[in-house]
């Protein structure tokens, strides 16, 4: 029997991916204050630190626990800047104006914590957006509801704005499943054992 998996995230996309792969889990959202981690120019180091701190925060809420705690963090990186979730609609509009007709990176780092042993892994995918007309940006944000998405777009509802996706689409959604598989293998756990 596999160890219980605790998802330390309220992300609907991460939940969806685990459900899609029939991985049973419980949710204990991390209440970690992300502003405690400052960005120093390295998107991978930044997201790994955030994922790690979220895992530690969940372990404090759910201790002691003979379980696997899984957390993650996703950002968009372009031209030396990072884009997280927009603060408001005006911020979302500005993000899409910056990212349109460009190729940018989507970086997701995940952390797996078990009995004090922390493992982190990252994946980067490239996304190219189309030249979204100014008069379509606001309607896209309103229709799709992208204020909860880093970069202010949703790859699952990107039909008219996505030109190209290079890399793992699960990474873009917030949970690179192969990275999770490799991290669990380092703990001698096979992700296949979780699938029903």
Swiss-Prot record:
Its EC number is 3.6.1.9. It is an enzyme of class 3 (hydrolase). GO terms for molecular function: nucleoside triphosphate diphosphatase activity. Keywords: Cytoplasm, Hydrolase, Nucleotide metabolism. InterPro entries: ITPase-like_fam (IPR029001), Maf-like (IPR003697). It comes from the Bacteria. The keyword Coiled coil does not apply. The active site is at 73 (proton acceptor). This is Nucleoside triphosphate pyrophosphatase.
